[in-house]
């Protein structure tokens, strides 16, 4: 499903609905995914395989591969929000929402959700090298992630650590750069207290920016600005979040057209305290057991 979105959102527990206007198109897709386009026309990815050339034996020759679908989407000037319709994603979101979920279970759930979202976000985005090697039984065509192309994960502390916990098991040879951004609970403005980003990211880097909750948008906007200042284009960044809300998505769309956001779910609103409703509470406190009380 692909949808073009107007200026306002309204979501239900069963189906994402958007107001005031909505245009949807559906097509047969081997890897179905729901994604929402902040533009007037819908866009839907297709798996269009790339043809392979003959390979010499016992060698691995570098050839960057990217499916035509991903290339065409990246070439567009639209911000897309992907909500993968995977039953495990729905399961872990449900575990996270439950106020009775204890801290260890919550942290495991958010880590498993992060693994699934990174898997979906890396689909057809990571460059590969193809070639032929010898298996114990004879020659075999192979395809590996290209080790020359830098892959980085940037978790926003604290809760981003939990969501990115399984990044290394999904993404080969990735680097992790920590970024600490806190939010003033009165003004809701972000403040950077830890910055372990490089002065400049290597050329052709692909970066996964991980923040569990996109509510008012202050934290993710500050993080995006820091990445852009260090030489990254919007096409080199993918945002991973457990849950998102319209205020944050609208701000990202306005300033960073072309950005791709992968979310477990989109909720309809943010309250006056800056929390998503119904949301999942404070992801950092619930991940690390530091929540002493909760005022709804």
Curated annotation (Swiss-Prot):
UniProt organism field: Arabidopsis thaliana
Protein name from the UniProt record: Uracil phosphoribosyltransferase, chloroplastic
Reactions accelerated catalytically: UMP + diphosphate = 5-phospho-alpha-D-ribose 1-diphosphate + uracil
Regulation of its function: Allosterically activated by GTP.
Localisation per UniProt entry: Plastid, Chloroplast
Annotated function: Uracil phosphoribosyltransferase (UPRT) that catalyzes the conversion of uracil and 5-phospho-alpha-D-ribose 1-diphosphate (PRPP) to UMP and diphosphate. Is probably the only functional UPRT, since the dual-domain proteins of the UKL family seem to lack this activity.
Binding residues annotated for 5-phospho-alpha-D-ribose 1-diphosphate, in chain numbering: 158, 183, 211, 216-219, 282
Family, similarity comment: Belongs to the UPRTase family.
GO molecular function: GTP binding; uracil phosphoribosyltransferase activity
Chain positions recorded as GTP binding sites: 148-151
Major subcellular site: plastid
Biological process annotations from GO: cellular response to phosphate starvation; developmental process; UMP salvage; uracil salvage
SUPFAM superfamilies: PRTase-like
Pathway named in the protein's UniProt entry: Pyrimidine metabolism; UMP biosynthesis via salvage pathway; UMP from uracil: step 1/1
InterPro entries: PRibTrfase_dom, PRTase-like, UPRTase/APRTase, Ura_phspho_trans
Pfam families hit by this protein: UPRTase (PF14681)
Cofactor requirements of the protein: Mg(2+)
Interval spanned by the transit peptide: 1-61
Domain note: The N-terminal sequence (1-125) is sufficient to address heterologous proteins to chloroplasts.
Enzyme Commission no: 2.4.2.9
Cofactor binding annotation: Binds 1 Mg(2+) ion per subunit. The magnesium is bound as Mg-PRPP.
Deleted gene: phenotype: Growth retardation, pale-green to albino phenotype and flimsy roots with less branching. Loss of uracil phosphoribosyltransferase activity.
Induction, as annotated: Up-regulated when pyrimidine catabolism is impaired.
Binding site for uracil: 281-283
